[in-house]
Amino acid sequence: MLFEKSVLVPLGADETFALITEPDRLRRWQTIAARVDLRAGGGYRWTIVPGHSASGTFTEVEPGKRVVFSWGWEGQADLPPGASTVTITLEPSGDGTIVRLVHDGLTDEQAASHGQGWTHYLDRLAEAAVSGDAGADEWAAAPQELDAIKSAEATLAICQLVLRGIPAASYQNATCCSEFNVSQVAEHMIGSITFLGGAAGAEFPQTTATTLEAQVAAAAQPALEAWNRRGLDGTVKVGPNEMPAGLALGILSIEFLVHGWDFAQATGQRVSVSDEVAGYVLKVAQTIITPEGRGGSFANEVPAGPDAGILDRLVAFTGRAA
């Protein structure tokens, strides 16, 4: 059984090919994180929504024309990586390009569910082709059965969306983090990502990324992939200390969501987060941030107000005035 769908986008074939294959472009409409080795025999891993990552191998790559890759979901026995095939063909049409997607090797039930998914994301592809970014993905907003991995992926998506909205001219804007501008807060966050990713065995290739969003994404992708491989059982070594694995990874959710709020405040943006995700991160913060830890990494808690939402309560707990 197969699913097939076409969409017309107002871009040339080369621009469209970049939009469907390059990690920086994929994050604008389909993925939270993407690793891509774009060659025949090269692998990929795309985190589509929190807790759901597809992976496989490219079998055909014709830049500007066609890409074929195996497809499956990590951790799913009914459609594991490599169990099906996706073919995307690009055909020039007037001033635009027709994107034709065929997903083969599915059961009837899988074709129906993947049809819903591909329709959703091809609509977002068309939107990104027009506006440059399809914006927040409603499917990623409130993951079911939240755990430390899903929370980290959900909050990363939120933070990256804010970072994509920051022009380079605003990188020096002051933030509510004392004496740190936007660029410096991002640098601090990347340090936290590599430190905590290293606790799960992540390796970080050199990056040529220039935007803050791309730099954060280049660190976050291997970090979260390593945590997915390792899982949340047992403890990990964080500096000189042993910590429960889930608690150590939970620090990244605080980093992504709270610093995403910092970036938004510094650049005139708003953070959109579900109560489920914000509430999960608040509980993690209340576990990690102790009175003894105040005054160093975290300022003293400030009043949040009786009508404060969960995100406002979180940032107030970390010493920020909403």
Positions of the model-derived regions?
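Hydrophobic ligand-binding cavity/cleft-lining segments
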Residues: 1-35, 143-144
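Short beta-strand segments
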Residues: 42-46, 56, 181-184, 196
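Hydrophobic pocket/interface hotspot
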Residues: 16, 26, 44, 58, ...
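Structured surface interface patches that mediate subunit assembly and partner/cofactor docking
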Residues: 25-29, 35, 39, 105-107, ...
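Alpha-helix N-cap/helix-start motif
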Residues: 29, 79-83, 111, 274
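Hydrophobic-ligand binding "helix-grip"
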Residues: 34-40, 49-98, 103-106, 229
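Conserved catalytic neighborhood of penicillin-recognizing serine enzymes
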Residues: 188
